[in-house]
Amino acid sequence: MECSWLRAVALVAVLVGLHGCATGMTARDRSSPSATVTLVHLNDVYEILPVEGGKSGGLARVATVVQALKAAHPAVLTTLGGDYLSPSALGTARIDGQPLAGRQMVDVLNATGLDVATLGNHEFDVSEAAFRSHLVQSKFRIVSTNVTDAGDKPFPGVPTSLIVPITSGPRSLRIGFVGVTIDSTRKPWVRYRDAIASARAELEALRGKVDAVVALTHLSLEQDAQFVEAVPGIDLVLGGHEHENWLMYRGPRFVPVVKADANARSVAIVTLSFGAPGERPSIAVRLQKIDDTIAATPAVDAVARAWVEKAFDGFRREGFSPEAVVATITEPLDGRESTVRNRAGRLTDLIASALAREADPVDVALFNGGSVRIDDVVPPGPITEYDIIRILPFGGRIVKATLDGALLSRVLEIGLANEGLGGFLHASGARREDGAWLVQGRAIDPGRRYSVALTDFLLSGGETNLGFLTRANPAVRDVRELRDIRRAVIEELRREVLTR
């Protein structure tokens, strides 16, 4: 089957989309390899059950793929390129007074048979206590070359590099792993070392001790390209952070950089073929779509569903009815990250309308695309309260405030410039026309005060490039807290159906 080509980006010599590829793409041909090792890679997994109405993903299906590969050839390792503790709708459920905060993810990944992972930036969304607890809970190995605790020491059980012995036929091989993470989530209890310098030091320590070096990365695509160019000696990069699959080759050694689709919609299957000892392995990559044609492994599925029921009990105690049908929708609601961080759509319009109605009367309603975490399309049909929790897992209150026109104009302009980021803003009541911002059809008056509905997070100053948007800003006045945004969206959906 032919592989489809994806967009070219700066600093990338060759970028190939993996969608639908059934044939391998080989960095260097070698006849009759004497040993092979297969790596099954996934990244950015927040859901333990299938997504897209059950059509795609599901860790129990991933387990089936891994087991089938091991049955044919036992030398198989399963890897994860970070982002698994958060953000997750189930992770916000409280059990015994504490949020799950990824506990369910670790348990299901343990059952799936994950071998090696690195840390993603969203691992640090949870509390330090929860993070450290999950390290103990994990049966898989975690490697992190550039992330330490506040004392600049590795977290317990998280080495800066890792050597995994594996037997392939008559050969005993040693695969070296390093792991690096983007420094985008800053917490007092986390420190980031320079990824390139840290990896170079670890590769020097691994020299002569391993048959291949694999870098597990949670970096942007551009950073991955720079990383491979700057760190010689890496044979393969298995990445994360992007939520869509990528394959690119970089550097003088034509090193593959591989990413799968988020939420286990696909896994990358990478075969390392070893010839004579000391020679670089040849590498072949293919994408395996994870969908409803693959049976779920019953034991893993049972673990996942048990956690869903525990989480649902937690939501019920908070006053939600997760299985209750809110409405029957006739159009899909697109909550994919690639959509909500770049343009408006049916879902974002619905959320903005819910904010405006909750704060009525109001001139403008604003929220950040990054608050939508479902990274999925809700198909036409019944939509439940749990679907709304999946869409907005962080919840938070809607707030109504008065903003000076100059500040509102600045916020809107930066929100538009944040295209592609979580800080891309969606608005009701405001639009840009001929280079100027209009509110309720009229140009913003810098000296006028406007009533604005927004989320408490957006008013915390925590969003990208919007650190000035806080309650302490003198141009922000009359702040009043309203209901949880999820309650307002549930009510807005019900109202839309009734008035159709």
Residue ranges with predicted function:
Residues M1-A10:
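Bacterial N-terminal signal peptides that target proteins for export
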Residues L15, G20-T36, V40-L42, Y46, ...:
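Non-catalytic terminal accessory segments
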Residues L11, G113-V116, Y386, R442:
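Alpha-helical protein-protein interaction elements
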Residues A22-P298, N342-R357, A365, I391, ...:
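Acidic, metal/ion-coordinating pockets
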